[in-house]
Amino acid sequence: MPHHAALSYPWTARYAKFLALVLLYGATVHIGNMAGLTGTPWLSTPLLWRGMDVALLSFEMVAAIALWRGLGWSVWLVFCGIIGLQFLPYTMWRSQFILQPEDAQTLNGLLGTEAFLLGMFALLLLIKK
């Protein structure tokens, strides 16, 4: 079954809209980072962090709009984007994102939350409800 059809099921469509809101929240966090509202001036953060802020802001805005509109390709975008832009960098280059001891716990929480959100979405897509 095409993914756009799966997004037409009531619970899957509702969850897609919920994920869109979660992604918009993430986008506002990246805007806050860039504006220096989250504690550290953006230009004093590592270049990798700044690049990730830009990449994730772009991804989260496009994915949120596409999910909200129920576009079939948004399913692939969300899974590939979260895996490629969060799981891989935050595990492969983990030390680059941990400047203070509490950063490790924050990363673990973020990855756990993302895994849960993707797992629920996958479950809804598979059971097609």
Predicted regions, residues:
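Topology signature of small-to-medium multi-pass alpha-helical membrane proteins
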Residues: M1-K129
